[in-house]
Regions:
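Divalent metal-coordination and catalytic microenvironments
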Residues: 18, 66, 75-76, 104, ...
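Bacterial Sec-dependent signal peptides at the C-terminal "C-region" and cleavage site
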Residues: 3-11
Length: 290
């Protein structure tokens, strides 16, 4: 595996093949462990303590940017102003990495929760006016349905409306492109089925210069708990059984293949590898040198 970690950068960087990837932290979500499901409170406390995590545990919100064949690619867009005061740093981080929002040509969306798409907006305008937003067809159909706000529980309506608002200027400008699982979105980047957390949750498998990497979105929210208990999900999962199956499938594949992993909610910069350890997995942050 070809991966190096930028030791002197003010933010995390890694090299996959010949391409440098910058990790961008949009912010931190507090008390995410309180949203975990299928685990008793006492067991949760034990798991957090054993992993050295705070109780309740917070979760970073990571996105990634890189240049590929003359295109500037952003994986997820953070929460922006949709989730104040905890998020909204992504555009500033992007500039620190040497990119202007106007340079971004493609945004790969793992799923359309607000902490991944809210940052598409700058006020009411497109934060990335020259970008095409790529999202799974079923995911877009679900979240952009005009009937969804009325069908949803009242406490979720503000977030749903924020999600729809974030995509609206891009859809109006014909800058949303949908895909199906298995599609090659950009050269060497393939959309893969990880549905369960949301209807069209997607992981992106990237094959570049003999190296392979996986952007796994929200497979894991609290690493210290879920790597050991793959059946533990969150109350935001659209299908807890499907989400657990996706976790098992993609963690096992990551460990087996030795992929570089980029995790949206893994400890910043969210770059590492996965190692099988009996019936569960361990996260190894940073570089893995062949």
């Amino acid at each position: 595996m070809l991966l190096t970690l930028g030791a002197c950068a003010p933010f995390g960087t890694a090299t996959v093949g010949s391409t440098r990837v910058h990790a961008l932290q949009d912010g931190v979500q507090p008390a995410v462990s309180e949203a975990l499901t299928n685990i008793e409170p006492a067991r949760l406390k034990e798991a957090l303590h054993a992993a050295g995590e705070a109780d309740p545990a917070s979760s970073p919100v990571n996105a990634y940017v890189f240049t590929l064949g003359g295109r500037v690619v952003l994986v997820d867009a953070g929460g922006g102003s949709a989730l104040p005061p905890y998020q909204g740093q992504l555009a500033a981080m992007l500039r620190s990495a040497g990119y202007a929002p106007e340079q971004v040509t493609d945004i790969l969306i793992t799923h359309m929760h607000a902490d991944h798409v809210g940052g598409l907006l700058d006020g009411s305008a497109m934060q990335y006016p020259n970008a095409t937003v790529h999202v799974h067809a079923q995911e877009a159909g679900f979240w952009l349905s005009p009937a969804l706000p009325e069908r949803a529980p009242a406490q979720f309506r503000p977030l749903i409306l924020a999600i729809q608002s974030a995509l609206r200027p891009y859809t109006q400008a014909a800058r949303v492109r949908t895909f199906d699982y298995g599609a090659e979105i950009l050269p060497g980047i393939f959309a893969q089925d990880a549905g369960g957390h949301t209807p069209g949750h997607t992981v992106f498998l990237w094959k570049q210069d003999g190296a392979q990497a996986l952007f796994w979105g929200d497979l894991i929210h609290v690493a210290g708990v879920q790597l050991a208990r793959l059946d533990v999900g969150t109350r935001y999962d659209s299908s807890a059984p499907a989400a657990a199956q996706a976790r098992q499938r993609w963690l096992a594949a990551s460990a087996r293949e030795g992929w570089t992993v980029f995790g949206a909610h893994m400890p910043y910069p969210g770059i590492g590898t996965v190692v099988a350890d009996g019936d569960h997995f361990r996260w190894v942050p940073g570089p893995a040198v062949p």
